[in-house]
Amino acid sequence: MAFYRTREGAVTAADSFTALDSLYGQSTTASIQVPAGSSQIVGVIATISTDSATNGAATIASQLSGDGLSNGQETFVIGSQGVDGTPASNGMTNMPMTLDVAIPCVGSNQVSEAVAMDVDVGSAQASITLVFA
């Protein structure tokens, strides 16, 4: 059986990981408790959006940390964006990406999610779901 745990939030600065510590207005802890009995993270579902307010080319990465990770901190790319020109009326939908992983974890311990972009391309929001088994 798979368990899905999500956190979301604003990515507030370039070249600095920002913790994802919200759940769409619901009361929750900042970190994710690994479901009891789970031994690994088997999937990542991630999406990111920006307002494209600043021209630039950015790569975006996610970082997992905490005592719920058997092998320590993990960092992986979740997207990229290029902005050239004005963002007037350029609304678009970004579908989430999925990534199959095999990250060992410790049941009932904690995992924190954070996201960073290497270049400021405007205000950014990210959401990441971890799939535990």
Segments the model singles out, each with a brief description of its role:
Residues 6-8, 27, 41, 64, ...:
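Positively charged, low-complexity intrinsically disordered regions
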Residues 29-31, 93-102:
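Exposed aromatic-hydrophobic patches
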Residues 49-98:
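Terminal beta-strand-rich extracellular "head" domains
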